[in-house]
Amino acid sequence: MKINLDRTSSGFCIGVQGTIHVAEEKLAQSGELYCLGDVVHNEVEVKRLEALGMETIDIPAFEELRNAEVLIRAHGEPPSTYETARKNNLAITDTTCPVVAKLQRTAKMLHQLGYQVVIYGKKVHPEVIGINGQCDDEGVVIKHPDLSDPEEIAPLDLSRKTALISQTTMDVPGFYELKRNLEKLFAEHGHRNPGTQSGEWMAVRDIDITAEKTGALAMPKLVFKDTICRQVSSRNGKLRDFALANDCIVFAAGRKSSNGQVLYSICKDANPHSYFIEDVDEIRPEWFVGENGKPVESVGICGATSTPMWLLEKVANYIDKTFGDGSSNPNA
C-alpha cells in the first residue's frame, strides 16, 4: 500500500503561515500570548500552541483584559476590536492576512460610497464579522447562492445601488451563481445597470472604486468584485486530481474550517472513498480494504489551508506503520 502525501495543494496558506510564525516567535520570546479566538480553525494546532503558552480568549474575556498583548489572527477583526484594545491599553499584534486586509478596505470604501454591500459567506465566520464591521454591520450576508433562505435575502433593498463581494475562502462557482441570481432578482424588480438588457452587474477593480471615491469616474449602480483568494481556490483542481489518483483519501482538517469543508467536498465528489478526520484517533482500518477484500494500492493524505503539514505527516506515518508495511516513506 503506497502512501501519497499531498504537499502542493494542502497545508497552511500564506496568511495562516504568517500568523503561526508570529505566534511561535512571540511565545519563544515571552512564553505567553493571548489570541482572540482560535488562532486557526484546527483544534490540533490550537492545542499545540496553547501548550507553548498561548491562551485563547473570546470577546467577553477580551473586553475585560487590560495591559496585555493580544494576537489578531489571519481572519481579521472589525474596527470595534481595535477600539476596545485602545481603551484597555492592549498591545495588538496584528497578523490579519494581507488578502483579507485588502478586502476589508474594499468593503469599507464601497460602504462609504453608499453601496449596499452583499457578502457571499457565512454570517458567524470571523472573517465575515470583520468585513461586515467595515460596513458598520450593515452588510447583507448570504451563504446560499440559490437565494433559498428567506431570512438571508429579507434585508436586501432592491432599490439601492449594490455591490457583491465574497469571504475569501468561499467557492468560486457559488459566488458566480449568487451573482447571476442577484442579477435576475434585481432585474425582475426593474433595477438594472443602464445599457444592459439582461441586468448584468459590472465587474469592478480597486482602481474603479478609487476613481469613484475621488470623483474621477462614476461606477454603475450594480457591481461585483470577486474577492475569493486565488491561492485557496487554485488548490481545488489540484486536489480533485489528487483524489482521483488515489484509491482512498484521508482528509485532515478542523471541523470549524470553512475551507476544509469546501475542499473535503471536492475530494468526496471526485472519490467516494474519502474520509474526514481531525486527528489519527479517528482513522478506521476498513477504509483501507478494497472491494476485493485486499488492501487498497494507494492512500492519499491531504488537508485544508488551516491544516499544518506536521499533522499531515503524522497521519501519513501513522497509516503507513499501522496499516501498511512501513516502507512508503511519506515524508520524502
From Swiss-Prot:
EC primary class: oxidoreductase
Signal peptide: none
Recorded metabolic or biological pathway in which this protein acts: Isoprenoid biosynthesis; dimethylallyl diphosphate biosynthesis; dimethylallyl diphosphate from (2E)-4-hydroxy-3-methylbutenyl diphosphate: step 1/1; Isoprenoid biosynthesis; isopentenyl diphosphate biosynthesis via DXP pathway; isopentenyl diphosphate from 1-deoxy-D-xylulose 5-phosphate: step 6/6
Known function: Catalyzes the conversion of 1-hydroxy-2-methyl-2-(E)-butenyl 4-diphosphate (HMBPP) into a mixture of isopentenyl diphosphate (IPP) and dimethylallyl diphosphate (DMAPP). Acts in the terminal step of the DOXP/MEP pathway for isoprenoid precursor biosynthesis.
InterPro entries in UniProt: LytB/IspH
GO biological process: dimethylallyl diphosphate biosynthetic process; isopentenyl diphosphate biosynthetic process, methylerythritol 4-phosphate pathway; terpenoid biosynthetic process
Active site, per annotation: E127 (proton donor)
Family: Belongs to the IspH family.
Cofactor: [4Fe-4S] cluster
Binding residues for (2E)-4-hydroxy-3-methylbut-2-enyl diphosphate: H41, H75, H125, T168, S257, S258, N259, S306
Pfam families found in the cross-reference section: LYTB (PF02401)
Protein name: 4-hydroxy-3-methylbut-2-enyl diphosphate reductase
Annotated residues for binding of dimethylallyl diphosphate: H41, H75, H125, S257, S258, N259, S306
Keyword terms, alphabetized: 4Fe-4S, Iron, Iron-sulfur, Isoprene biosynthesis, Metal-binding, Oxidoreductase
HAMAP family on file: IspH
Organism whose genome encodes this protein: Chlorobaculum tepidum (strain ATCC 49652 / DSM 12025 / NBRC 103806 / TLS)
